[in-house]
Amino acid sequence: MKKTLLAVALAPLCLPSQVFAADESSNDVMVVTANRFEQPIKNVIAPISVVTKEEIDAIQAKSIAEVLRRLPGVQVVSGGYGQATEVYVRGTTSRHLLVMINGVRIGSATLGSADFSQIPLTGIERIELIRGSRAALYGSDAIGGVLNIITAYQPGESVAEVTAGGGSDGFYQLGGSVAGGLGESGWGKIALKTEGADGFSARKEPFEQDDDGFKNSNVVAEVGTHVGDHWKLSLQGYYHDGESDYDDSYGAPHAQSESSLFNIAAKAGYSNDKLDSQFTVAQNQDENRNFNDVSSGSKIKTERTVANWQNHYQLTDGLELGGGLEWYRDSVSNTGTQYAEDERDNTAVYLTSIYRISDWQFEGSVRTDDNDSYGTNNTWQLATAYNITSELKVSANAGTGFKAPTFNDLYWPDSGNPNLKPEESKNYEISLSGTHQLLDWSITGYQSEIDQLIAWAPKDASNPSGDWIPMNVDEAEIQGIELTAGFATGMLYHDVSYDYLDAKDKGLDKQLIRRSKDSAKWNVSYLAEQWQLDVSAIYKGTSYDDAANTKKLDAYTLVDIAASYFVTDNLSVRGRIANLFDKDYVAKETYNVQERSYYATATYKF
């Protein structure tokens, strides 16, 4: 289901300057992630979820994890704000989810994934999540999906606002933003936020029983201008600086983590009636240091420089062509032990086409990546959709993907394996969906086969007590069914989903850890006069915390409730209760979870 009907269903009930003030139908919503160019969501074959700033404000999410866990096909395991977070999209790990900010990939080249605790909600205008492989367009990491966090300024009237709030466990937040036009053809935006909490003990006894808190500061900024009728220039920046406490697995006292993320991108775009072309140069830096009372630790840093030239051409009314060149260089450094190799380049070319004739749509994409460390990888994707009626559509999708070995896998001193190959996947899905005036629904079946999974194994198979190194030894098979529906009953809007997931380690014939076979979500929204209400219930079925499936994690249901009151056109106050029924559950063995908690915020718009 395309998560856009909510704004449409509630728009007639809204006050003019408050929330969900869109007047366009859900099919007119534009997205950019599915095929690397802007297109109406109705033309996207891939399963996509879109979450707007207004929806994030309504549910009063405090982290990106709280937004993602409401979406179909997603399971989230988190230790709370500022703690390690795992995101499983269709049963794949966080390492198999490509994360981008404004279309530029982020994440650590040493760990191989983005740190979701470093991605606060500051300045976010929209989130787009593609479920399923998109490697034929984006290359490595996009086996399970693509998450694009968009902070880019959305044209419209100028706006300025300040927000302050607090809550349980010493939580606080203070932020503000200004956005609007600059001169006759320019625009600018800046958003700042600081937040933190005293927290609670991340782990159970016998681990250290102290509060594990966090504090973050974040800045999002953008300036841009139109040059003539065809050119557009912009500079976008994002900065995060954070500290968090955690409980060390080895019992070291007062373990802490310091992290920073810096992303800047310069973009030049040209467009006319037929052609859209954009050139991007970006720099991304990711730093992390873990330390405690015993050790000062070492700082591990990833620097990624990116250059990308992408194009989209409307050849005829029914035929669109796209393609581009992408180059990026990953560099890593460690103030402690040095890597055997600390730099690698990746050069890629990609092509895509979309053809529509009558009630049919066909898509095809191919990409070639050439990398200094692991050679050449070719990926492809084919998709088709048929409109059975104006309200009913059937679609199918097939493709391949890969995940590059990390610097830790390849070059960590004394334990890296420079002979590693990328993990590879084959992905298939078929879907039936319907779009009606106040009802969207879909049923999707999918299968993914992932080979050459990297795992620790004995260097000498005949000597399991000897040295262990990363090796391509595992295989996984993932099958699932997604059911989604969005509909209105009177003044209530319902967004429901059910996921059946069978994610197996083929070698062990066991379920992959922390993936529930059954999960369900029900989100209800209500808006009338000056009140807005959001209730969510998330069910996560039984799962296992170990590869042998001996440590069972019981099923649980969490309910959150959020309410907003619009005092005036400028002032709003909001309150939220998380874990409404104070459910005591286990998301990860030996880790605590947050009890019932309360939050309140106030926002004033100028």
Curated annotation (Swiss-Prot):
Gene Ontology terms: biological process: monoatomic ion transport
What residue stretch is flagged as signal peptide? 1-21
Q: How does it sit in the membrane?
A: Multi-pass membrane protein
The short sequence motif called TonB box sits at: 28-35
Checking Pfam families in the record gives: Plug (PF07715), TonB_dep_Rec_b-barrel (PF00593)
Mind naming one GO cellular-component term on file for this protein? pore complex
Q: Which GO terms describe its molecular function?
A: ABC-type vitamin B12 transporter activity; porin activity
Where's the motif TonB C-terminal box?
A: 589-606
Query: Where can this protein be found?
Result: Cell outer membrane
Signal recorded as keyword? yes
Matching InterPro entries:
B12_transptr_BtuB, Plug_dom, Plug_dom_sf, TonB-dep_rcpt-like, TonB-dep_rcpt_b-brl, TonB_rcpt_b-brl_sf
Q: Which residues form the TBDR beta-barrel domain?
A: 157-606
Keyword Signal listed? The answer is: yes
Q: What does this protein do?
A: Involved in the active translocation of vitamin B12 (cyanocobalamin) across the outer membrane to the periplasmic space. It derives its energy for transport by interacting with the trans-periplasmic membrane protein TonB.
UniProt cross-references to HAMAP family, sorted A to Z? BtuB
Sequence similarity: Belongs to the TonB-dependent receptor family. BtuB (TC 1.B.14.3.1) subfamily.
Q: Could you identify this protein by its name?
A: Vitamin B12 transporter BtuB
Lineage, opening ranks: Bacteria, Pseudomonadati, Pseudomonadota, Gammaproteobacteria, Vibrionales
What gene name does this entry carry?
A: btuB
